[in-house]
Each structure stands twice: as structure tokens, then as C-alpha cells.
Amino acid sequence: MTSPTFELVIGEGCDTSVAEGVRSALGAHVPERAVHEVGQADIVVAVGGDGTIMRVARQVLDAGASSRILGVSGGRLGFLAAFEVEELPLYLGAIRAGTLSIENRHALHWRLLRDGQEAATGCAVNDVVLAAGQPFRAIELEGEVDGGAIPRFLGDGLIVATSAGSTAHAASAGGPIVAPGLEATILVPLAAHSLAWRPLVLPAEASVALNVHHANEGSSLVQDGRLAERLQAGDRVEVASHFQTLRFLRHPERPFGATLAAKLGWAAPPSWRRPGDDA
């Protein structure tokens, strides 16, 4: 975001601050605020790609805040971003007035148990993945959903995704796309050693537990596309809906189907050329 655009965003009558390290890049004369204070904001503006927006959303969760999140595309894809930088001036009035609709999205909370003790915890906006990792032999998992056993899994990994995450890694692995407003937790296998192990859509409030029976040296728990913890045989990973709901501001004129088509090429016809067309 350029400094002139930033000045438009803050406008008059807005008590505005920026995260540490951002002020110098913008050349803006506004207070800096520590990341852990993000929950004090009414609206948190995240400018960047999906990774940036997810990181900001996790900070809101960690702060226990109900801040609204305004995602502004500044990366390569920005599927989670409702707005493009250049169109912000058109909607600043509605943003300041608080008249934009809010899209509530559930997130995930996970914890890693090792030797019966809690070894690590975290939260995810899109997904939690138990990945086989190097040297790329299959990972073996035994799972439970709400305390009931599900078939043992053997393969490259297992994705536990939110509805928002259904358009990310889960979609690339053949999982279903879930529209906003339909909250769900989705299990999507990665290269399962069984043709019958298919994606499974669960209620958002379902709790999933995965016991690691076999792991590789590089087996990992991946949170929103980033390494969170290494896994080893005997570990147990519990994933449940986060007690907080994320509140994203919605674009008033861009339905979900249009976003899918524009950013993911959803339902696009195959490319072809007529004989004689230029190469």
C-alpha cells in the first residue's frame, strides 16, 4: 500500500496506528502499535497475500479479540482479500460507517500431545496438515471424530481444513469447495493408500484426533502452510473449532462465485485455438 492510499484509509476522525516496522515503509506519521495489541482495534487492515491475511487473523485470535478484518490484496493471489488496493477509495465511506456486511468464519485450534503431555498448541485459519515429509515414506495415522474411530490412514498426509481453507491446499488435493456461511471441518487425504479413503465433510464443531503410528524424520504438523512442529511416532494431534469466530468484511458487489472464477479459474472452459489462429 502506498502512502497516499494509506492516508485515504486513515482519513479524518480515525484513531489509527500501524504495526511495528510498517510506519517507515509507508512514510506515515502515525503511532506504532505492538503486534500483541492488535485486538484493541475495531478494524484491522491486512494488506498482502493470503499468508499475510492469515497471519493477521491468527494474531486477532491470539489476542482474543472481536476485531473486524479488512483484507486488501497485495500479493499474488489474495483469495482471502475482499478488496483490491485501487478500489479502496470507492468503499472507504462504507468501511468507516460500519455498513459493510461481515462474513463470520470459524477457525481451528490444535494441540500436540507427546508422552501424554501437551507439547504445543496453535490456531489455523485455513488448515492443519499432518504431512509425511522426508524421506517421503507414508505416514500412518489412526483417527477419531468426536471420540468415534475412523479408518486408519496410510499415505502422504491428511488435511483438516475449515470452509475458508476448502479453496486452498484442500482444493488442490481434490477436496470439496465449501461456500461461505456453510461452516464445516473437512478431512482431505493426500495420496491415500486406499482408493476408498475419500474427503469427508464434518460439522464445524466436530473434534478430530489423530494418533501418529508411523512417522518419518521429516514428518510435520503444518499450520496454514507453515511448519509448526515436527511429528514422531506416538504423538497425538487434537483439532477442534476455535472458540472465537473471525469477522471478515465482505465486498458488497463481489459474490463468492465471481471470486472463485476470477482468482481460481473456477468452471473456466478449456483453452483452445482455431486452425490458423496465431500461436
Regions of interest found by a model, annotated:
Residues 1-47, 54-62, 85-103, 112-122:
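ATP/NTP phosphate-donor binding region
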Residues 45, 49, 73, 128, ...:
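A residue-level signal for conserved active-site and pocket-lining positions in enzyme catalytic cores
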Residues 51-57, 167-172:
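Short glycine/serine/threonine-rich phosphate/pyrophosphate-binding segments
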Residues 64-68:
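A short helix->loop->beta-strand "cap" motif at the edges of active sites that frequently abuts
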Residues 77-156:
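Catalytic core of DAGKc-family lipid kinases
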Residues 104-108, 124-126, 137-141, 156-158, ...:
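A generic structural signal for short beta-strands and their flanking turns/coil linkers
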Residues 130, 146-149, 198-279:
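ATP/nucleoside-binding phosphotransfer catalytic cores, i.e., glycine-rich phosphate-binding loops
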Residues 152-196:
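Gly/Ser/Thr-rich active-site loops/lids in small-molecule metabolic enzymes
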